[in-house]
Amino acid sequence: MPHGHPQLTNLFSPFTIGKMQLRNRIMLPPHGRVTGNPFGTEEEAERFFAYWRLRLQDGAAWIDGLNCFLDNTVMIPGFEPQGLGATIGGYFRLPHFRERAGRYAALCHEHGAVATAQIIMQGGMPHSPSGRLANYTNNLVPHILNEDEIQWLINEYAFSAGEIQAAGLDGVELHANHEDLLQLFLSPATNDRTDGYGGDLDGRLRFLLEAIAAIRAKTGPDFCVGIRLNMEELFAGGYDADEGIEIGRRLEATGQVDYLHCVMGDNWGAPSYVQPHNYGAGQWAATAGRFKQALRLPIVYTGRVSSAQVAEEIIAKGYADMVGMARAMFADGNLISKARAGKFEEIRPCIGTNDCLHRILVEGLKFGCSVNPRTGYESEAPLIQVKAGKYVLVVGGGPAGLETAALLREKGHRVTLWERDGVLGGQMQAASRVKENRAYTDFIAFQQRRLEKLGVEVCLNRSATEESILAAQADVVVLATGAQARRPAIEGIALPFVLEGREVMLGKQIAGERVVLVAMEDHMQPLTIASFLVDQGKRVRIVYPTPAIAPLVGKYSIGASMAKLSSAGVEVRVMERVERIESGRILTRNIYSGVEQELRDFDSVVLACGGVADDALYRSLKSRLPEVHILGDAYAPRRISFATRQAYNLAKLI
């Protein structure tokens, strides 16, 4: 197979790790659990296999997609684990592990790729090397493992690797990062043991080295063994990059490790290990480059490798031998073939919202991608081309309207899109005014190119009325008219210094130097507006009525936003509902006790209160047209992933 586009000669060159022959430099790192459960029902397993099948057909070289938890009961009969991974432990002991893992391996090999699995033992919840808490976001006091329990775990690692090998996979990766038990032993912040498994680096490494040795004794020399390692710990008392490199040297010296998978961040921090759009593309790749300079081991780097061009640059600069790309492959399962052909403008861009993960982890919903409604649903039949196309009018050029217009045109309908503003994107336009959200403009630009290529007629500055829609004589009308700003029933909300956050971000209203932000939206809007105000040098106080900040923003994103706001001196108040706004005074009331408090010393009040569905046209037209639909924020104000998925479901029906 040719090496591909001349701009990507390094990315599409072959490479060898251990006995694994790789046709390009792209690894798809572990994320299989979010796309389906290979060990669950047959339907769940098929979702998992269908997801990977598409990416394998596209040319993936290495799928590290089977991430499995060890049995975390750790010798204690009847013990009930707690915390992350508690309900999904012990995959390797399942009676059908070999059969399902074997199907995964066979699928990869059938398409010319290698297949590896990752062994996870989530630590600190409740198992830990010492009594120190694993992170600062909870107070779960862990059980301190004794030496018999450590040996039990080492044996479990060896057994699990043997099961992986017996299923036909090419290798195993140990998860020594992101608050895994192995990392907790490595870290001076969480390991203060005084026996042979603590103290200096030799002691802190002992558990990991003994696990590796046990795996090698079980699997032999030809089975690939890799270590996924935090390059440094960006929190108080953790190890720095110099010590991380020394850990790498000692792993290399064993002669039993085939590669090092270099990452940054933890489950809860700033950064998290799934870095949101607050961070630059490949932000810590240069740190991986330090490891590559110091070691002979092949280096894999994962961390916001958001495009093929970023991946190429990382390889070309010598920062890594391979790159891990997960969310970029969520956004476009055909990224590899499009990049190989130089069709860069046809690749759906990942915009780093992390809603793909938060949907599952915060709300218990199915996996979904903000920019690609097909991701996670590959097992469903694709859209069917229509034999006789209809004329469809789509009103509204936000995420829902853009996706609907494109999908219906791809099905064979004739489509016109009306947008009342002079630009497409809807509320994404306002959100993109914050520098960490600039990736939103990439998605808007992608959709514009897509519509133009498909031949969708786009009419900007075109307001829709009941009469103009009827006059268009469309067979089908789709109303994606978005949401209006919600103005809660707060006394004084009409005062001239009370501003709407969206209007402030668009520059239509100007906030004073001292701002009180009324936060009555549960996702990113208050944090985004606060970030915008901070960038303008404003002094900001945020008032939330909820017991927690941004309750629908999950652990992988909240840290980055709060780190920025905290560093800027933003004051956050929770459990306070704004009752009354006056000139020079705001009255709040505690949602539980009813205790009133006053806020003073402000120039402006800015509202971040979400939206109210703009459904007036739908209500007036639904009885006057043969087929009219409503979707996106016009139906219920929610996030991008809901809008694009609803667009896809609607497109199936028309």
What are these regions (language model features)?
Residues 351-364, 469-491:
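Helix-enriched interaction subdomains in cytosolic or periplasmic regions
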Residues 59, 295, 318-319, 454, ...:
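Short, structured coil segments at secondary-structure junctions
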Residues 445-486, 579-588:
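Feature captures the FAD/FMN-dependent oxidoreductase FAD-binding
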Residues 6-15, 45, 374-379, 457-463, ...:
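Short gly/ser/thr-rich secondary-structure transition/capping motifs
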Residues 417-453, 523-576, 635:
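Rossmann-like dinucleotide-binding cores of NAD(P)H-dependent redox enzymes
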Residues 260, 291, 314, 326, ...:
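Hydrophobic, well-ordered secondary-structure elements that form the walls
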Residues 1-395, 399, 403-415, 423, ...:
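Flavin-dependent oxidoreductase catalytic cores
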Residues 386-420, 459-470, 480-555, 592-604, ...:
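Rossmann-like dinucleotide/flavin-binding elements
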